[in-house]
Amino acid sequence: MPTDPKALAYFAAGIGAGLTIMGGAAGIGRLAAAAMEGIARQPNAAGDIRGAMILSAALIEGVTFFSLIVTILLAIK
């Protein structure tokens, strides 16, 4: 049974994109859970924790977006 290489590339890109999204979501989820725990322990540091959480979440989103771009580029090549 012959397999089209383009179809396999799209399939691999879909799997890569899915794993990327799941990894980013898991990372941001763990980040938010740790931030909420930190705020619960020290309510006075809520502003600092929130700022660090937003910055870290943005960095995770950036890496996730970059990885999605790479998977799309690999699929259309």
Please give the residue ranges for each predicted region.
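Hydrophobic, small-residue-rich transmembrane alpha-helices and their short perimembrane loops
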Residues: 1-77
